Amino acid sequence: FFQAEDGIRDVAVTGVQTCALPILELLKSVSFKSLVANCPHCFNTIKNEYPALGGDYEVIHHAELLTHLVKNGRLRPGFNYKGTVTYHDPCYLGRHNRIILEPRTVLAAIPGVTQVEMGRCREKGFCCGAGGARMWLEENIGKRVNMERTEEALGTGADIVSTACPFCMIMLDDAVKANGKGDEVSVMDISQVVEKSLG
């Protein structure tokens, strides 16, 4: 068992190195202070795996950047939005990197927004179904993961399901539409909700 696991790990490490090295070369060719990622998967890889390959950068997720801008008064959501938002914690943002309060802080800064939590949220959040390349898998047994998660989101009564991951957005949006709620409920990145609040 351990030999097989080590062999799989070796293949995975080789694959990461093959993909990462051209990106590391590109990053070395430009000058920057911080790298901002909107994808939690990319954020996690560059922040936590690239240092072992020689890529040690300050990496922040756009939820952290938006929180910083709101707290420092450089971003002032002003449009009074009357609506309810539930936030879906992406796995690689919430559970893996503990970025949990930041997206909620951004949403709380928008006048008129009422936040409601799903039953499984924050550190105990539930996957959208895209992880592990399941986004491209047609599940034949049981309920699709994105359908289960979206039903939980719809059960909150929110008119916006917000997240901070492009993969989660696709999975949740597909399931909202499959549930026949596409005209009633929007799926939006937190940055889109902020943009909407700017008038």
Feature map (PLM): residue ranges:
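Single conserved hydrophobic/aromatic residue that forms the stacking wall/gate
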Residues: 1-19
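Iron-sulfur cluster-binding electron-transfer modules in prokaryotic oxidoreductases
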Residues: 17-199
